[in-house]
Amino acid sequence: EVVSFDNYSTGYKENKQKGCTYINIDIREGFTDWIEEFDVIFHLAALARIQPSINKPSETIRNNFDSTLNVLEYANKKNIPVIYAGSSSKHHGLYGSPYAWSKYGGEELCKLYSEVYGLSTTICRFYNVYGPHHIRSGTYATVVGIFENQYLNDEPLTIVGDGEQRRDFTHIDDIVDGLVRCVGRDYKGEIFELGSGVNYSIKDV
């Protein structure tokens, strides 16, 4: 059984899948005891993307840090392992954006709860995830989503810079596979990079 908690600040309700129970909740407000216990928590919620975090640093940091703290507090109370979505953005500089810092802070919180309280936490970093339901337009759109949207609308593909920027692009199915492989391992703050290990330039894409 899968239960999803989401406030839909960046997600879409039309992306709902069969076999999953959806609860509209803002995890910054914490969890209540009426919530049933779980075998594992995948903490994937965050205000993502670099540019929006630069425009709204306080909102991004408070949202991402406080929500992670609430998840860890609840998990520690119920002794539920947590698998946390860290960020590959810190590799571009920890202080390069409020988003990168907030996700790094979340990683450190996971390590803290493992070290001090013995909570099982696993940190997984994603690399440019794409798939059927990625966002195609707006502030939170990914580069693959933007290209796809422009292609479908018979528009020229927009390249910023010389197009030689190289990235590791990872399909969502591979991300899910990596996350599932971490279940039941009883890790204590270990970090895993989930990617293909092969990079492509924006021109290649």
Place the predicted regions along the sequence by residue:
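N-terminal Rossmann-like NAD(P)+-binding domain of SDR-like oxidoreductases, especially those catalyzing
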Residues: E1-V129, D173, L179, K203
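Residues at alpha-helix caps and immediate loop-helix transition turns in enzyme cores, especially N-
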Residues: W34, L94, R136-T139, V143, ...
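Glycine/proline-rich active-site loop of Rossmann-fold NAD(P)-dependent oxidoreductases
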Residues: Y104, V129-G145, N153-P156, V160, ...
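Activation loop
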Residues: K18-G19, S87, T139, V143, ...
